[in-house]
Design a protein with these regions (language model features):
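Polyanion-binding surfaces on beta-sheet-dominated domains and ring/shell assemblies
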Residues: 1-180
């Protein structure tokens, strides 16, 4: 017996492909509309909100002074975490971080590291003793697609607006984080 829903879905997808349309009505090569707002989180040292179609993402940057990793005594550190909560989409569940949220954080983290947009040595305060730890927190409020793109954009925009709070930690004057 043929299952009705998969057959109807397959027929609808075939019709959309023939008409060069996507499920949401956009053309085959048409992207989602993107808006970007920065400095939108009061308690973060840098922040951004990205709206990409129906996807809404916030990213915030915080700094802390840490002991450097033994194999990189003159380099700061970067940590990126992502939250996918049930409010974003019905497929997400409450509780500890899901494999999807862990992977999302890792992908954004790796993209920032591998791009070299932050000079990790510029985050050194005292070699072998003190470095800046950069923490990026990403919160997906609505997942309408393209969350990897939206999260990456939000993280980079938040970094570009971040001020290193050196005065608060008594290690100099505040300065804008340099992002290439």
């Amino acid at each position: 017996m043929v299952e009705l829903v998969p057959t109807l879905l397959r027929q609808e997808l075939a019709r959309l492909a023939e008409d060069n349309l996507r499920l949401d009505g956009r053309g085959q090569w048409e992207g989602r509309e993107v808006t970007l707002e920065t400095d939108c989180l009061y308690n973060a040292e840098g922040s951004a909100k990205v709206v990409m179609g129906d996807t809404i993402v916030y990213a915030g940057v915080k700094f802390e002074i840490r002991t450097p990793w033994p194999d990189r005594p003159a380099q700061g550190s970067l940590m990126c975490g992502a939250e996918l909560r049930p409010v974003a989409h019905r497929k997400y569940e409450p509780g500890p971080p899901s494999p999807q949220s862990i992977e999302l954080g890792r992908v954004v983290d790796r993209g920032i590291r591998e791009s070299g947009c932050i000079d990790m040595e510029s985050l050194c305060i005292v070699p072998g003793e003190k470095v800046w730890g950069v923490m990026i927190d990403i919160h997906v409020l609505s997942d309408g697609g393209n969350i990897f793109d939206a999260c990456g954009l939000a993280a980079i925009a938040a970094l570009r607006t971040a001020t290193v709070p050196a005065e608060r930690f008594d290690v100099g004057e505040d300065y804008t984080l340099k992002v290439n």
